Amino acid sequence: YRLTYYTPDYQVAETDILAAFRMTPQPGVPAEECGAAVAAESSTGTWTTVWTDGLTQLDRYKGRCYDLEPVPGESNRYIAYIAYPIDLFEEGSVTNLLTSIVGNVFGFKALRALRLEDLRIPPDYAKTFWGPPHGIQAERDRLNKYGRPLLGCTVKPKLGLSAKNYGRAVYECLRGGLDFTKDDENVNSQSVMRWRDRSXFCAEAIYKAQAETGEVKGHYLNATAGTVEEMFKRAVFSAQLGVPIIMHDYITGGFTANTSLSMYCRDNGLLLHIHRAMHAVIDRQRNHGIHFRVLAKTLRMSGGDHLHSGTVVGKLEGEREVTLGFVDLMRDPYVEKDRSRGIYFTQDWCGMGGTMPVASGGIHVWHMPALTEIFGDDACLQFGGGTLGHPWGNRPGAAANRVASEACVQARNEGRDLSREGGDVIREACKWSPEL
């Protein structure tokens, strides 16, 4: 492999798709051989020379390991940079992109561990994807909500409620001041609560809350199902009910299903909320798997208006600078290379709409100043137990979150430092809000 696929003198083309792998070779295996093996197996190579190699223009189509960079402070671990010609990939297919780059290389005997840290999607390839159904600005225009983070809540307990009581919980949260409520990721269509019943009661709750508050409200109705046909049946029913947003578990549901659902949402005026269930199986190990920034990039390409991104301050894992790095990759049109934030390549999205990050998991009103400072306005903050755990009930819990959010936004706009004065801001707001 090394003689053909390790090319340190290669000049990267603007159209190349670039990958950065964190690579741990087996003892005694040269890093150059491992990097070349990854490049070969994820492009044109196989374990031996075949006679059809002579019928192929190998220099045009092969992947190339063009740089190896030792990881500081770690022995026998490298960042391998690999360039893939754009012709190796089907246009507009995240499924094909991931199948090619990570589909077959992670089980190599020569590798002790391998992790895909980042991808550079060149403009020529990015333009073949539709991206999010609507994007951040179009969502704000549809909701008529500006200048603050959006607020949500996951209905708990996630399983066990009847459809009618589930709808009642949704209504109380929306009436209290939240913008959205949410199905949990494993709420599909169990015997205790079938999807059609849940959809009908949630739609009733949405319309009642909208009429009483004068605000646009929504509930993430989970369309994820065992078959694509059933998924679309649920999405179509949601569109017929006139609700503004539905939901999909994109990793367990699959990228092909997600892209199809995203296109349906675009054509039918539905926002699409994306949950990342099962992501930690893939991205949590430091030296093996796929970093979440890659999963976030590929979701933006496949299509989703919201994506769960971690909180930095709650119960789920996430380093601040690294989290903010992939949050910017989700919502900004252009992101510069910045290794301190884990961004290995400059990324130009060529006008593709942004995906709104969703902070969810173990957060409550005392986290509101930090969340407002960290994520800014273009984020959705979701408080499950932080709403439903209020001693007075769901509606006061929702009101407390809304008051805390608006107090933090006002304090920030007045120039106050939320990182130092956040606690004082919340305590001052408590004087005017019994719920808080």
UniProtKB/Swiss-Prot annotation:
One GO term under biological process is: photorespiration
* PROSITE patterns assigned to the protein according to its UniProt record, in alphabetical order: RUBISCO_LARGE
Q: What cofactors does the UniProt entry give for this protein? A: Mg(2+)
Chain positions recorded as Mg(2+) binding sites: K182, D184, E185
Q: Please provide, in alphabetical order, the Gene Ontology terms of the cellular component aspect for this entry.
A: chloroplast
Q: Tell me its EC number(s), please.
A: 4.1.1.39
Q: Which residues form the signal peptide?
A: none
Q: Record's superkingdom?
A: Eukaryota
Keyword Oxidoreductase recorded: yes
Q: Name one GO molecular function term.
A: magnesium ion binding
Listed under subunit, the entry gives: Heterohexadecamer of 8 large chains and 8 small chains.
Q: What does this protein do?
A: RuBisCO catalyzes two reactions: the carboxylation of D-ribulose 1,5-bisphosphate, the primary event in carbon dioxide fixation, as well as the oxidative fragmentation of the pentose substrate in the photorespiration process. Both reactions occur simultaneously and in competition at the same active site.
Q: What else is known?
A: The basic functional RuBisCO is composed of a large chain homodimer in a 'head-to-tail' conformation. In form I RuBisCO this homodimer is arranged in a barrel-like tetramer with the small subunits forming a tetrameric 'cap' on each end of the 'barrel'.
Q: What is this protein called?
A: Ribulose bisphosphate carboxylase large chain
Q: What is the lineage of its organism?
A: Eukaryota, Discoba, Euglenozoa, Euglenida, Spirocuta
